[in-house]
């Protein structure tokens, strides 16, 4: 565990699309630190079987967006961290934290130093003695964002986070904006699904017409 001095230009719900026809990603939290390292943090509530490959896709999209045309060396590619926070143990070993870096199968101690790290944080880990107490408290707080959970911790950082959360919740204006943003995203997804279904029906209809014309 180390301190991460972040720059000011960080954001939430940052959308990234590398190519016009490629699938975009919407990052929950995107941050850059003073050492120019990239952090993308995602909260995943539902257990899905594609989270590992989803983390791979997010990392590849970020990497592609970082290296501009004409840059002479791949060594200028920034280190990046994909952090997935889940209220379940995706891997089943009881750990609060699983850190993945590319390693050599033939030489387990040989790590490919490519600067790409993926971390999965499990709020329901069972090995508190192997990680910091602050991380355990933070993960518990993220799952149960309550006054009671915030009062349990000695971490001033977590208490500051809770104070900020309380201010956001108590602000009617921010609350309304949050709900509006949530509703907009919900309807955008629904419209996208409906457009997809409509296009699918159109294609089916075209196929039927083509087949009938071919018979005639």
Labelled PLM ranges:
Residues 32, 39-44, 134-216:
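Short, charged alpha-helical interaction segments and adjacent helix-coil junctions
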Residues 1-117, 127-129, 191:
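Accessory alpha/beta interaction modules
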Residues 125-129, 209-212:
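A short, ordered amphipathic alpha-helix with a cationic face
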Residues 84-87, 122-123, 169:
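Pocket-edge structural micro-motifs
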Residues 106, 114-127, 133-145, 152-153:
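Upstream accessory/linker segments immediately N-terminal to the RecA-like ATPase cores of bacterial MutS
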Residues 12, 24, 38, 66, ...:
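A near-ubiquitous, low-amplitude feature marking generic local secondary-structure context
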């Amino acid at each position: 565990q180390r301190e991460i001095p972040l720059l000011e230009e960080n954001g939430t719900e940052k959308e990234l699309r590398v190519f016009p026809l490629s699938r975009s990603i919407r990052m929950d939290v995107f941050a850059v630190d003073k050492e120019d390292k990239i952090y993308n943090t995602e909260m995943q509530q539902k257990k899905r079987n594609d989270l590992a490959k989803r983390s791979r896709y997010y990392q590849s999209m970020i990497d592609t967006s970082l290296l501009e045309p004409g840059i002479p060396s791949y060594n200028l590619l920034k280190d990046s961290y994909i952090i997935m926070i889940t209220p379940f143990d995706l891997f089943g070993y009881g750990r609060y934290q699983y850190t993945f870096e590319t390693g050599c199968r033939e030489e387990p101690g040989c790590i490919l130093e490519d600067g790409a790290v993926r971390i999965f944080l499990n709020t329901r880990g069972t090995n508190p003695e192997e990680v910091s107490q602050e991380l355990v408290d933070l993960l518990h707080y993220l799952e149960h964002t309550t006054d009671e959970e915030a009062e349990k911790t000695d971490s001033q950082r977590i208490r500051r986070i809770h104070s900020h959360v309380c201010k956001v919740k108590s602000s009617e204006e921010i609350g309304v904006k949050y709900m509006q943003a949530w509703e907009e995203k919900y309807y955008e997804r629904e419209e996208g699904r409906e457009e997809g279904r409509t296009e699918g029906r159109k294609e089916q209809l075209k196929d039927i017409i083509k087949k009938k014309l071919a018979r005639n």
